[in-house]
Amino acid sequence: MKKSLTVGCVIMASGLSRRFGANKLLADFCGQPMLCRAFAATATPGIAARIVVTRSEEVQELCRAHGVPVLLHSLSGRNDTVRLGLSALLEQLPELSGCMFLPGDQPLLCRETVETMTERFCLEQPCPAEWQKETEREIFRLGAVAENDPTPLVGSPVLFGSSFFPELLTLPENKGGNVLLKKYPAQVRTVCIADSAELLDADTPEALQQLEVLARLKN
């Protein structure tokens, strides 16, 4: 038997928020900066380590105020965010089995969903070495099945097994992990949830308002 698998999480917060008109991650959502929702969603034992990767000093200050590890950088590519975040986690946990990449702008994503994804990856119980090795060659993405449509709506977060780390660290310029989902479709597993709203991001102030209405209705 091997020890249980270990999952890290990169919270991606390097976007420019062009459509939003301001730093959307700092916008108020139900009484707190929207990024705080990502803090709450990833505060689970299933995430052994997490880090926010950002180009914003204000976001850096927010992370520090909440005790969330943060990496400030000035690079522009999506590949840079992936590489910097994963590299930082691997420095902390060299034996990392998987890494989740979670956008900071999906405020309805809940902790239970993150736990479901990590449990699916870790298979809940310690397992034989060959089974673990197989799991580390898989990619888990979040999805939701809509009524009258058997094809799931898919999106983020996405959890990559460790066998994909070398390619994640050397992605093409300005490309993200979706490159690997297209390259290895047979290795992609979809973790479906009931509420498709968890997949929605807040790219505009109007979208943020709509998501806040949904959040208040749930409460």
Give, region by region, the residue ranges found by the protein language model.
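N-terminal glycine-rich phosphate-binding loop and ensuing alpha1 helix
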Residues: K2-E57
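Conserved alpha/beta core of the MobA/IspD/sugar-nucleotide pyrophosphorylase nucleotidyltransferase superfamily
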Residues: K2-L5, P166, T170-N219
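Short beta-strand segments
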Residues: V10-S14, V53, L102-P103, G143-V145, ...
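Short aromatic/basic micro-patch
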Residues: D28, L108, V158-L159, T190, ...
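Hydrophobic residues at beta-strand termini and immediately following loops
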Residues: F29, L71-H73, L142, V191-I193, ...
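Conserved N-terminal catalytic core of the sugar/cofactor nucleotidyltransferase
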Residues: C36-F101, E112-T113
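Conserved beta-loop-beta/alpha segment of the NTase-like Rossmann-fold superfamily
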Residues: S76-L169
